[in-house]
């Protein structure tokens, strides 16, 4: 869920977050190592295919590791060029998602003002900034959602009166059970609400 958790104003010396008044949790979005890895791999592979297609058309070797000038342009060079173009489009999308930091943001819980604020970055446009606010007294519980199997899901949700459950954890790689339990218990203790789903 968080890249870091910061507890401000009234930190207790024994690390008890229930004595403080502000809990700020940063949420990691699309700027994860795995996204950088796949964007780099797709860029390299697609560039190779694209340059191989161009090389077979121009009969000029544009690649260091092989000589694609021996390929016949129709159909091999053409198909490699099309694969390269499709791969470069996919790589562009992946790099833009990383640049925009989709899904990144923070969860801010402030007992002094009695407000919570959930902030996430979205796609560019009029709804780029996604902000959800509520009063702490409207929070009913912190819910843990665990689904095992081929596509496991482990997430924390905030159950608020009159609203759908608000997701608090990052999208992508699921958290470990220990980390999920720790963060859920810490948040429930801080807000003074029950922890459901365990």
From Swiss-Prot:
Topology class, membrane: Multi-pass membrane protein
GO biological process, one term: photosynthesis
Keyword presence, Thylakoid: yes
UniProt-listed InterPro entries: PSI_Ycf4_assembly
Region listing for Disordered, in residue ranges: 1-20
Membrane-traversing stretches: 36-58, 78-100
Pfam families hit by this protein: Ycf4
Keyword Transmembrane: yes
Subcellular location: Cellular thylakoid membrane
UniProt main location, coarse: membrane
UniProt entry keywords in alphabetical sequence: Membrane, Photosynthesis, Thylakoid, Transmembrane, Transmembrane helix
GO CC terms in record: photosystem I; plasma membrane-derived thylakoid membrane
Protein family: Belongs to the Ycf4 family.
Function: Seems to be required for the assembly of the photosystem I complex.
Record-given protein name: Photosystem I assembly protein Ycf4
Species for this entry: Nostoc sp. (strain PCC 7120 / SAG 25.82 / UTEX 2576)
């Amino acid at each position: 869920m968080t890249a870091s958790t910061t507890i401000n104003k009234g930190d207790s010396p024994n690390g008890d977050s229930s004595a403080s008044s502000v809990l700020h949790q940063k949420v990691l979005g699309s700027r994860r190592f795995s996204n950088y890895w796949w964007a780099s791999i797709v860029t390299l592979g697609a560039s190779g295919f694209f340059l191989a297609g161009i090389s077979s058309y121009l009969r000029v070797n544009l690649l260091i590791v092989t000589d694609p000038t021996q390929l016949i342009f129709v159909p091999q060079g053409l198909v490699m060029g099309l694969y390269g173009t499709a791969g470069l489009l996919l790589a562009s999308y992946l790099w833009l998602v990383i640049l925009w930091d989709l899904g990144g943001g923070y969860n801010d819980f402030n007992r002094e003002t009695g407000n919570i604020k959930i902030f996430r970055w979205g796609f560019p446009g009029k709804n780029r900034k996604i902000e959800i606010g509520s009063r702490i007294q409207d929070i009913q519980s912190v819910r843990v959602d665990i689904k095992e199997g081929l596509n496991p899901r482990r997430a924390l949700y905030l159950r608020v009166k009159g609203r759908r459950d608000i997701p608090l954890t990052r999208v992508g790689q699921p958290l470990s059970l220990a980390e999920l339990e720790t963060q859920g218990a810490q948040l429930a203790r801080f807000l003074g609400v029950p922890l459901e789903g365990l």
